[in-house]
């Protein structure tokens, strides 16, 4: 439905922005405090099952290094929530 389409578009845009920040960090253009804040915020987004479902659908459209980064953060979140 339309609401789901809007949510998918919104979440996809957020992930694209995070991918850009990941790239900027990898080339030394992003302040470490800004990076840490982004990672913390991103891990919160990745704790939502709906967002994980969307990620599984859109992840092939991202660079492999970013996919690995996101998958690592998802695993960290799963470990955290199990403790």
Q: Each predicted region: which residue ranges?
A:
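Amphipathic alpha-helical "stem/stalk" segments
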Residues: 1-83
